[in-house]
Amino acid sequence: MITQMQNLTDAEHAILNQTWRGKKILSYLQAYGFDYEFCRSFRLTEGEKTGWMLLFNATLMICAEKPVALEETKTFVEMHLPFRIECPASFLPTLVTLPNYQKLRRTMFVLTPQPVSEEFQPEAVQKQPDLTAVYQILHEGFPNLLSYPLWLTDTSHRCRHGISQVLTYRDSTTVTILFDIENHVLVGQVATCAAARGSGYARDFLHWLANQLQQQGKYAVLYALDIRVSFYQEIGFEAADTEWVLERLDIEKEDVTKGALQ
């Protein structure tokens, strides 16, 4: 059974807090609660098993310790047709049979502290950059990025509420701290404008950020699709896990092979 949620119990919060996807769901609930049409959460139940889903715009996130309500979840996806599905591996055999979806592998990397180069300029890090400029940088690297109004509304809302933080370096490279829950930090939206690629800005910026977060006692990770894995390996970040996500193939984008923004 799938029912829309109006609240979250302490026990459910504790379960979601055990995984990165669960923490991501919690961050959206912290940002938006249960009253927005574009951010809806659902409880999956089957016998004594329970799972949770959150549909934010065109992304569906599923968190469950065991497979639960698989056929109902498949029907839910057929009705809503999210662009991306992030789910436990146990859901994939059922959901991968849906037409017009492709599997994309992504790797979790730990932001391992590394020395920055002598050329790095910490004073060039902006902690409250102009978000319009940030979007322009992101769009060059992620053609499947949300439309500007949707991205700006969500990003500015999450930043105002202290859930996320957007950073830039030399007005050329950007990275976002998507959430920080009990010193577990998810980093994403890493991009460098085309004119500055090959400059080493992203390498230094990420090393600086990894060092800063470690000094604050935080454990930080990011996800990378296969096309970007070699970069994170080259800069010394450690691969910790791999998983598969599903993305729609029937959406006309500039370059769907790059996948949507992480």
What residue spans do the PLM features occupy?
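Short amphipathic alpha-helix that is part of the acyltransferase structural core
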Residues: M1-S27, R106-L150, V256-Q262
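Conserved donor-binding loop and adjoining core beta-sheet/short helix segment
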Residues: Q18-P82, D171-Q189, C193-A194
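Acyl-donor-binding surface of acyltransferase catalytic domains
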Residues: F56-P122, E243-R248
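Conserved acetyl-CoA-binding loop-helix of GNAT-fold acetyltransferases
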Residues: V68-F76, Q189-T192, G198-Q215, E234
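Conserved GNAT acetyl-CoA-binding A-motif
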Residues: M79-A89, L213-L225
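Conserved active-site tyrosine of GNAT-family acetyltransferases
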Residues: L95-L98, F231-Q233, F237
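Terminal substrate-recognition subdomain of acyl/acetyltransferases
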Residues: T112-V116, I227, E234-Q262
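A mid-sequence, solvent-exposed acidic-amphipathic segment
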Residues: T132-L186, A191
